[in-house]
């Protein structure tokens, strides 16, 4: 069979023209792009390939930023907490912040846009009781001894955080920090639209404008040693300015307070249950960002080019699963692929013509150096993401960075050639078809579809000890044969019958976080809707501290469904006798030994009629319970692994009372998975490991056959 070409984007630069042509041929690439820190060679204009041009809406024009310092982008910063030991307290604003990145904004009215908080009382300090001294950079407070205080203030972003990150990682020398200007403000808005037109007129050879992005950077702050200090990939605190906030006040109908963003210092991160004011601000930002983004996209279309958005960096307000996004008219979205869940962040996007995954490793020296192993990183990245692609296909793949680094690793070049060929085959077999889904699953949390697939993410695709046991559920779902939706508590309050659309509901997270739900569980509309859903035959899987909030004599509000409760000292007087395990349960049939619960949970005990599957030292790790016609499953934590993915798969089937549906498009070996595309008349069997595997494969009609597979292998079959 002749090798195919296409659906692959590669980076280039001025010093790798011949090498770019070689790699294009080797990998079958049909698109070339520039990257941050590289330039597109004019010699490659006429290769016949699609040409992407990275376009920065908010930076790479320091002359404009310097001439209009009042329209440089800003962010809200809160100082650390300081304890007053006398009646006067001074707080230095820029402590532990990188001085070249931020500059305190004293241009606008600090009495209106700053806030000094008494963190002991939770109240703002009256303006007449504090003052700012520019010569020292300190705020002086008339304090109450032994109360604690913080200062929330606006700062200009003098060095774009992403440009700074790239400069630090790559050790760029003598590079002028790129300032971040605010495209939303009047003069810069007018200038930016003209600037875009100038770019299009001088880059007639460009086919795709790759916007990076529209228009506000996620929260990323560096400390005085240029180390990452604070990051929130969903953070809104760098999308502010007095100009924007005054517009918000007019729309919202109430005065803005810095605390609506600062949120006691938590900055409304993904784990915080969002306040009404913060939701209002997000909705306002989404509408305004979408309107301006549409203007830019329309201009690109006017010049006969495609508009692509990079999902990251300055992307706040562009949440792609919200209604505003559909009105923008983008042709494509490209996203960085860290794992299966990060791929689903953009592969599930509607209202675009195509999506593209930028795979790892990025061609930067942190991976491509003597002793580095880019092949290993590429294998892990591809095999992990492939599970998700098989459930929700993307249309293109690509790579970024310095091509001159990648070509120094011939084994890497050879492996990516295999990946490109495999992807094209995969695309041909599954594109345009919904894969077989055994059940409809809803993940319930405070964010719903707004943060679908990213609701346990702090920084893009990175591991955190405190959440990997929960994120494992999301990663497993990203490549499992379920029709997965993300719903919020507000969705249920608006329409309790919504739950009838699903077979199983999953709630995963720690108590009183946005993931678990906190006080939403004492809202009778929510709790009764979930109980009714399960009682009438639905399934409920709770992981960690699901439905947990101390109320009316219990912590687990759905203890009647899950059959477990958490001992917090209030039930020590009550003896517990149910500790027998039932490890022969349907859910555990494929487990070879001990189940990995990750960090697990302490002090979980079972109610008298609950069936415990696993307990350790009289702490329940997994249990099942029947409630009416429905079933509940409790799991203390479930990090991602192939075995745990199978545990979750069986838990979904059991909770939905669908054990008999197990042997349908199924592999007996949990390291191997089966995906069926009935409309296309095809199915595939995929080995997710780096070793050969043997399995028995069940087809959709229940018939089966034995199969030996090589490492990472994927086999395609016809149905029928």
Segments and roles (model prediction):
Residues 2-59, 63-100:
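Noncatalytic N-terminal accessory/assembly modules of large enzymes
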Residues 6-12, 29-35, 100, 170-190, ...:
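The substrate-binding groove and active-site-proximal loops of carbohydrate-active enzymes
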Residues 8-22, 35-39, 309-318, 474-498:
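A short, well-structured beta->alpha microelement
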Residues 9, 15-50, 195-212, 325, ...:
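Catalytic domains of carbohydrate-active enzymes, especially glycoside hydrolases
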Residues 44, 62-68, 196-197, 207-214, ...:
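Hydrophobic targeting/anchoring helices
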Residues 69-327, 345, 431:
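Polysaccharide-binding and catalytic clefts of secreted carbohydrate-active enzymes
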Residues 220-223, 404-437, 478, 557-572, ...:
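Extracellular ligand-binding/catalytic regions of CAZymes and related secreted enzymes
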Residues 517-593, 598:
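A glycine-rich, often tryptophan-bearing local segment used as a flexible ligand/cofactor-contacting loop or short
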């Amino acid at each position: 069979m002749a090798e195919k070409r296409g659906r692959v984007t590669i980076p280039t630069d001025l010093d790798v023209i011949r090498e770019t042509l070689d790699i294009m041929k080797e990998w079958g690439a049909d698109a070339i792009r520039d990257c941050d820190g590289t330039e597109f060679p004019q010699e490659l204009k006429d290769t016949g390939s699609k040409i992407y041009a990275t376009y920065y809406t908010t930076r790479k024009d320091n002359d404009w930023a310097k001439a209009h310092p009042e329209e440089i982008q800003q962010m809200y910063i809160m100082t650390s907490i300081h304890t007053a030991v006398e009646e006067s307290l001074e707080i230095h604003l820029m402590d532990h912040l990188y001085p070249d990145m931020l500059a305190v904004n004293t241009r606008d009215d600090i009495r209106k846009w700053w806030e000094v908080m008494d963190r002991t009382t939770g109240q703002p300090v009256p303006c007449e009781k504090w003052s700012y001294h520019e010569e020292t950079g300190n705020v002086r407070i008339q304090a109450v001894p032994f109360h604690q205080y913080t200062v929330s203030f606006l700062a200009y972003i003098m060095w774009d955080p992403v440009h700074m990150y790239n400069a630090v990682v790559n050790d760029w020398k003598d590079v002028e920090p790129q300032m971040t200007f605010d495209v939303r403000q009047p003069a810069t808005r007018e200038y930016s639209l003209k600037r875009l037109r100038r770019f299009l007129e001088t880059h007639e050879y460009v086919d795709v404008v790759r916007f990076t992005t529209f228009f506000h950077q996620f929260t990323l702050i560096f400390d005085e040693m240029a180390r990452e200090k604070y990051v929130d990939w969903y953070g809104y605190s760098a999308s502010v300015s007095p100009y924007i906030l005054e517009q918000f006040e007019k729309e919202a109908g109430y005065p803005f307070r810095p605390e609506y963003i600062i949120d006691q210092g938590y900055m409304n991160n993904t784990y915080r249950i969002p306040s009404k004011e913060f939701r209002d601000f997000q909705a306002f930002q989404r509408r305004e960002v979408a309107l301006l983004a549409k203007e830019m996209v329309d201009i690109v279309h006017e010049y006969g080019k495609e508009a692509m958005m990079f999902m990251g960096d300055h992307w706040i307000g562009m949440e792609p699963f919200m209604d505003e996004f559909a009105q923008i008219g983008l042709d494509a979205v490209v996203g960085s692929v860290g794992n299966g869940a990060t791929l689903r962040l953009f592969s599930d996007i509607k209202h675009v013509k195509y999506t593209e995954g930028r795979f790892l490793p990025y061609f930067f020296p942190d991976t491509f150096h003597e002793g580095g192993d880019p092949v290993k990183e590429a294998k892990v990245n591809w095999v992990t993401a492939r599970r998700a692609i098989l459930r929700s296909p993307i249309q293109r793949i690509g790579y970024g960075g310095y091509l001159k680094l990648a070509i120094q690793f011939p084994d890497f070049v050879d492996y990516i050639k295999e990946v490109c060929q495999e992807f094209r085959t995969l695309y041909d077999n599954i594109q345009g078809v919904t894969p077989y889904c055994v059940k409809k699953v809803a993940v319930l949390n405070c964010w719903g579809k707004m943060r679908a697939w990213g609701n346990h993410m702090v920084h893009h695709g990175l591991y955190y000890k405190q959440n990997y046991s929960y994120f494992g559920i999301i990663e497993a779902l990203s490549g499992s044969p379920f029709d997965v939706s993300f719903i919020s508590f507000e969705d249920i309050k608006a329409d309790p019958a919504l739950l009838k659309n699903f077979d199983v509901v999953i709630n995963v997270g720690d108590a009183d976080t946005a993931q678990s739900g906190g006080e939403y569980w004492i809202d009778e509309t929510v709790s009764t809707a979930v109980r009714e859903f399960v009682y009438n035959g639905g399934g409920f899987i709770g992981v960690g501290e699901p439905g947990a909030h101390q109320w009316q004599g219990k912590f687990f509000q759905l203890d009647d469904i899950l059959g477990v409760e958490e001992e917090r000292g209030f039930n020590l007087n009550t003896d517990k006798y149910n500790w027998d395990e039932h490890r022969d349960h349907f859910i555990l049939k494929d487990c070879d030994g001990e189940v990995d619960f990750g960090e697990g949970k302490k002090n979980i005990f079972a109610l008298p009629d609950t069936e415990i599957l696993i307990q350790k030292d009289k702490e329940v790790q997994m249990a099942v319970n029947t409630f009416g016609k429905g079933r509940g499953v409790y799991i203390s934590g479930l990090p991602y692994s192939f075995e745990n993915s199978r545990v979750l798969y069986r838990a979904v089937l059991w909770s939905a009372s669908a054990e008999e549906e197990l042997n349908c498009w199924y592999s007996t070996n949990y390291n191997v998975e089966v995906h069926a595309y009935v409309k296309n008349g095809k199915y595939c069997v995929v080995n997710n490991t780096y070793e050969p595997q043997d399995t028995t494969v069940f087809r959709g009609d229940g018939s089966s056959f034995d199969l030996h597979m090589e490492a990472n292998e994927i086999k395609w079959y016809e149905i029928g």
